[in-house]
């Protein structure tokens, strides 16, 4: 993670409702469609902002794990498995996910990267064109609705004058190669009717992978176009497409990891792999109705196709109720979010934001055997007979209200509520002897209030108290398989609810920020992994859990182009009721969550010439199962980078190199929670290297 300057970033209050960058100057980014513009210092919530330019400084630009490891409360781990995405959790929410992102609400330019059921993914984020990434933790994330243990909002750069074209490339260990092209620009300054801004980027990434059977290739395209219609309104078009083909190496037992961490024996036997194709587009209209009123409407639609081959032996698949070892999904999703903001007086200055959010998703899910018989013997890795055929629908309608009250010069109150309603309907089209009609439906409804009080001790020191209630429904994937191995949906799985209280302090220190947050979250009916085997996972409700912790962060810039960033997270996440069958797990640590995380970096980064830096990351041990009988050991990693940036008239050339895991530490990058065969461990590489180049030309 790189350092950002606090004075350079401003946020919409509480980061509510997916802000977008509207205009910019040298010191601030002006954010539209938000109740008011506030700094990170003045936001009464635990929030971190990482600047896009800092994210790209001497990094591969392949994964968010390169640049977000210093965000307190955020546990981001690279599985070394591009078939399953990063493992990402905020304050422990999302740690159970065996693939993709769970328990966290993701947005890219206002378009949800999280489906209506709560399942998300980061593979469509182009780091080459990111303006910034905002990470919200704590009670106010509930105002985003379902699956909001935390919120991550990614904003694409808004094109500015002069027009610029940039080519970039990175080559690293294990045959990893990324290259891309980006064009940005604008006509006018964005304030006059007819002014246009644009950002278009495309990237290709290929790798052999650190482990056996872990190669991947990804093609990604991203575009953002803005048109100033008149002095009061703007129209923005967002487009994104990603195409991934990735082998899946799977997990290893402890003995296998120690013997050879690069091996993937079952993956090669079953030829486990995944393909993903996703295309989406969005349209945002923003209008200033008066000096006191603003409105905006965001519409989007997309489609996603996935095919996955799993490592399931032939014998279980012969059961008439088994869904097979190949999954094919076709998803179509769309949504609309409309909101109105009013600033007025009710004895004190007050701001109201109200709106309505609607999302829906249709899914055609089919299952096939992952083998074909040849002379009576199975040949794995081939699509066989149809074993599952269903159409699933999920949709939500959420009205919301947020208010902000300036009670006095030093005291302010923020309060909001969202009523979240989620419906699920499954229609079974595969009815055979031994496999009956498993159609079913479910609905979930919950009021989600949140509020905070902020007091300004001085102009540079604020303290706050916040509380709220969160809500997390099962995803379609979590509903898809029953723990008893029978056919049909796991409709007995209930949504979880959580209550959070948080106190925090933020202090500006020169050109930097020191922040501290203390919190406690109690959850009922926590959704946890019941079993995981062969790439297939079933889930259950765990009763009560508690997360309590502390987050400390310090970001500072010094004279002479030196930058320092440091953070520490302590998170005690435990079961408050028994979730195990054969022993009492009450009081056990929840798996997949590190109790301690630390990060520190220092860099010398002038505008041009030589630059260099180092960073260190500590990850505490992570339990792999509910019984706490298996765990991934703690580790500390150190990285170094250096480069040279050359500016000559309209040309900028940046050449750099880096080494990661400098001391060649052997470690487990992530765990597969409650893997039934003890294959918990997903190893990460030892010392590895990379070199990169960026060339930009400005048409002035």
Swiss-Prot record:
Q: What is its main location?
A: membrane
The compartments listed are: Cell outer membrane
Tell me the membrane topology, using the record's own terms. Answer: Multi-pass membrane protein
Q: Which UniProt keywords apply?
A: Cell outer membrane, Membrane, Receptor, Signal, TonB box, Transmembrane, Transmembrane beta strand, Transport
What is the consequence of disrupting this locus? The PTS-PqqU-deficient strain displays growth defects at low PQQ concentrations. However, the mutant can grow at high PQQ concentrations, probably due to diffusion of PQQ across porins.
Domain TBDR beta-barrel positions: 162-697
PROSITE patterns referenced in this protein's UniProt entry, alphabetically: TONB_DEPENDENT_REC_3
Please share what else the UniProt entry notes about this protein. PQQ is a small molecule and it may also pass the outer membrane without PqqU, through porins. However, this diffusion-dependent uptake process is rather inefficient, which may be a disadvantage when only low amounts of PQQ are present.
Identify this protein by name.
Answer: Pyrroloquinoline quinone transporter
Whose protein is this, by species? Escherichia coli (strain K12)
Q: Taxonomic classification, please? A: Bacteria, Pseudomonadati, Pseudomonadota, Gammaproteobacteria, Enterobacterales
């Amino acid at each position: 993670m790189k350092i950002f300057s606090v004075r350079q970033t401003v946020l919409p209050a509480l980061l509510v409702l997916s802000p977008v960058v509207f205009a910019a100057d040298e010191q601030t980014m002006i954010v539209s469609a938000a109740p008011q513009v506030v700094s990170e210092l003045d936001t009464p919530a635990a929030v971190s902002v990482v600047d896009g330019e800092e994210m790209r400084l001497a990094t591969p630009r392949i994964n968010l794990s390169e640049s977000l490891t210093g965000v307190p409360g955020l546990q981001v781990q690279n599985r070394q498995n591009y078939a399953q995405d990063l493992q990402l959790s905020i304050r422990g929410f999302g740690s159970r996910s065996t693939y993709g992102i769970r328990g966290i609400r993701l947005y890219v330019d206002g378009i949800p990267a999280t489906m209506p059921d709560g399942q998300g993914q980061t593979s469509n984020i182009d780091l080459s064109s990111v303006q910034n990434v905002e990470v919200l933790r704590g009670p106010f994330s509930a105002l985003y609705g379902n699956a909001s243990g935390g919120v991550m909002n990614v904003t694409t750069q808004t094109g500015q004058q002069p027009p610029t074209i940039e080519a970039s490339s990175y080559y690293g260990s294990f045959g990893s190669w990324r290259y891309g092209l980006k064009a940005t620009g604008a006509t006018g300054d964005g304030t006059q009717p007819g002014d246009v801004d644009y950002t278009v980027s495309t990237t290709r990434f290929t790798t052999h992978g650190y482990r056996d059977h872990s190669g991947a290739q990804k093609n990604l395209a991203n575009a953002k176009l803005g048109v100033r219609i008149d002095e009061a309104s703007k129209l923005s078009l967002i487009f994104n497409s990603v195409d991934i083909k990735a082998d899946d190496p799977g997990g290893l037992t402890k003995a296998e990891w120690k013997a050879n961490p690069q091996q993937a024996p079952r993956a090669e036997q079953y030829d486990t792999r995944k393909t993903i194709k996703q295309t989406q587009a969005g349209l945002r209209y923003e209008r200033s109705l008066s000096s006191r009123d603003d409105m905006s409407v965001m519409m989007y639609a997309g489609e996603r196709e996935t095919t996955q081959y799993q490592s399931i032996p032939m014998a279980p698949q012969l059961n008439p109720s088994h869904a097979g070892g190949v999954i094919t999904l076709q998803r179509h999703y769309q949504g609309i979010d409309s909101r109105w903001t009013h600033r007025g007086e009710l004895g004190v200055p007050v701001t109201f934001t109200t709106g309505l959010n609607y999302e829906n998703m249709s899914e055609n899910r089919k299952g096939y055997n992952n083998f074909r018989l040849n002379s009576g013997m199975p040949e794995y890795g081939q699509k066989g007979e149809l074993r599952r055929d269903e159409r699933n629908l999920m949709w939500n309608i959420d009205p919301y209200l947020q208010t902000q009250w300036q009670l006095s010069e030093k005291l302010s109150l923020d309060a909001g509520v969202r009523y979240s309603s989620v419906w699920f309907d499954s229609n079974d089209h595969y009815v055979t002897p031994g496999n009956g009609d498993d159609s079913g439906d479910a609905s979930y409804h919950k009021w989600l209030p949140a509020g905070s009080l902020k007091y300004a001790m001085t102009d540079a020191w604020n303290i706050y108290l916040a509380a709220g209630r969160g809500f997390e429904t099962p995803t379609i994937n979590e509903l898809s398989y029953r723990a008893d191995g029978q056919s049909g949906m796991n409709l007995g799985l209930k949504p979880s609810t959580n209550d959070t209280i948080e106190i925090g302090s933020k202090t500006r220190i020169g050109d930097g920020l020191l922040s501290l947050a203390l919190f406690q979250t109690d959850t009922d009916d926590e959704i946890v992994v019941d079993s995981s085997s062969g790439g297939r996972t079933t889930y259950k409700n765990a009763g009560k859990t508690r997360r309590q912790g502390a987050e400390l962060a310090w970001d500072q810039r010094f004279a002479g182009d030196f930058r320092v960033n440091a953070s520490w997270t302590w998170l005690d996440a435990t079961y408050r009721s028994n979730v195990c069958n054969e022993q009492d797990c009450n009081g056990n640590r929840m798996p997949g969550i590190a109790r301690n995380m630390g990060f520190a970096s220092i860099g010398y980064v002038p505008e041009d010439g030589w630059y260099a830096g180092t960073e260190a990351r500590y990850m505490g041990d992570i339990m792999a199962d509910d019984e706490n009988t298996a765990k991934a050991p703690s580790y500390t990693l150190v990285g170094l980078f250096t480069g040279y940036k050359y500016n000559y008239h309209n040309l900028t050339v940046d050449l750099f190199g880096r080494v990661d895991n400098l001391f060649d530490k052997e470690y487990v990058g992530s765990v597969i929670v409650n893997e039934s065969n003890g294959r918990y461990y997903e190893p990460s590489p030892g010392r590895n290297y990379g070199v990169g180049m960026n060339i930009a030309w400005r048409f002035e």
